[in-house]
């Protein structure tokens, strides 16, 4: 009987410890990291890494902050046409910012730009997409529905091609990005 209790304690105790340990490790990846609360210094730029699910901010001193993000399609492929739910890759700029009734804040990117139009035309010429396909638009960085930040924690890609952040993170980013801020998106 003693062996049974010892086995039960060791088995369940180690399971609980392993579960709690992995949650701690995962949560550190899902939180934002900021160099200083004072805000960025000088010109700001953004680099979004689709493979790592990260949006990083750089200023005149170098790295400033990294935020967890999610995208559209789980394939993480480059946007080919409207409706494919992929997030475009390339070099963009912020063209507008607004408070959004559904997604907290919306930071608009200049998609499609010349670079994305050229990739779209090449794909049409090669027959990779239908000849009547549209390039799409309305791509930006935004928050989630109220109380849906867990989508970011779970790396649940849910957008139509935009970049989604936790609401508190998009509010933070919104404070210091301006029209003309450069945004690079890559895999």
Label for each model-derived stretch:
Residues 4-12:
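Sec-dependent N-terminal signal peptides
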Residues 28-45, 50-51, 71-95, 123-127, ...:
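N-terminal post-signal-peptidase region of extra-cytosolic proteins
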Residues 41-43, 50-52, 64, 87-89, ...:
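Extracytoplasmic
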Residues 60-61, 97-99:
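Short polar/acidic secondary-structure junctions
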Residues 62-74:
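Short Gly/aromatic-enriched secondary-structure transition segments
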Residues 99-187:
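Exported/periplasmic cell-wall-interacting domains
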């Amino acid at each position: 009987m003693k062996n049974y209790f010892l086995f039960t304690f060791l088995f369940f105790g180690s399971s609980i410890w392993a579960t709690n340990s992995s949650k701690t490790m995962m949560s550190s990846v899902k939180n934002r990291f900021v160099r200083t609360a004072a805000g960025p210094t000088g010109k700001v730029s953004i680099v979004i890494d689709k493979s790592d699910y990260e949006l990083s901010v750089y200023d005149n001193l170098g790295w400033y902050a990294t935020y967890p993000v999610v995208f559209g399609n789980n394939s993480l492929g480059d946007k080919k046409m409207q409706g494919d739910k992929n997030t475009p890759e390339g070099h963009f700029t912020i063209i507008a910012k607004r408070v959004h009734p559904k997604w907290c804040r919306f930071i608009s990117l200049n998609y499609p730009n010349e670079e994305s139009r050229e990739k779209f035309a090449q794909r049409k010429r090669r027959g990779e997409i239908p000849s009547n396909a549209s390039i799409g638009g309305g791509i930006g960085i935004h928050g989630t529905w109220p109380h849906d930040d867990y989508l970011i924690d779970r790396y649940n890609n849910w957008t139509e091609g935009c970049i989604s952040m936790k609401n508190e993170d998009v509010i933070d980013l919104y404070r210091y990005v301006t029209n003309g801020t450069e945004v690079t998106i890559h895999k």
